[in-house]
Amino acid sequence: MHLTSREQEKLMLFLAGELAAKRKARGVKLNYPETIAYIASHLQEAARDGMSVAEVMQYGATLLTVDDVMEGVAEMVHEVQIEATFPDGTKLVTVHNPIR
């Protein structure tokens, strides 16, 4: 199987997001890379599921709370940006202040 660089990045993001989700489910507070991966992978899947850009942006702000991440991480994450694949093409999605 041959994957393009973009496909490899998406796969790595998915794997990192899955690892972060498992840790969150066990009650482990997420560090910075896990937090970004968790949010980004959920945004990718929401886009593939057919949500609009606006819906994905709103959804991204509901995924994590301050209690889900290590101390100081919420203050470090001002925005998360991804290029997501929607039914009508690839679009840039930005979620401002995703941890509330």
From Swiss-Prot:
Reaction(s) this enzyme catalyzes, per UniProt: urea + 2 H2O + H(+) = hydrogencarbonate + 2 NH4(+)
Pfam families documented for this protein: Urease_gamma (PF00547)
Subunit composition and interactions: Heterotrimer of UreA (gamma), UreB (beta) and UreC (alpha) subunits. Three heterotrimers associate to form the active enzyme.
Protein name: Urease subunit gamma
Family classification: Belongs to the urease gamma subunit family.
Organism: Haemophilus influenzae (strain 86-028NP)
Compartments where found: Cytoplasm
Pathway(s) where this gene product acts: Nitrogen metabolism; urea degradation; CO(2) and NH(3) from urea (urease route): step 1/1
One Gene Ontology CC term in the entry: cytoplasm
Group of enzyme by EC: hydrolase
GO annotation, biological process: urea catabolic process
Record keywords: Cytoplasm, Hydrolase
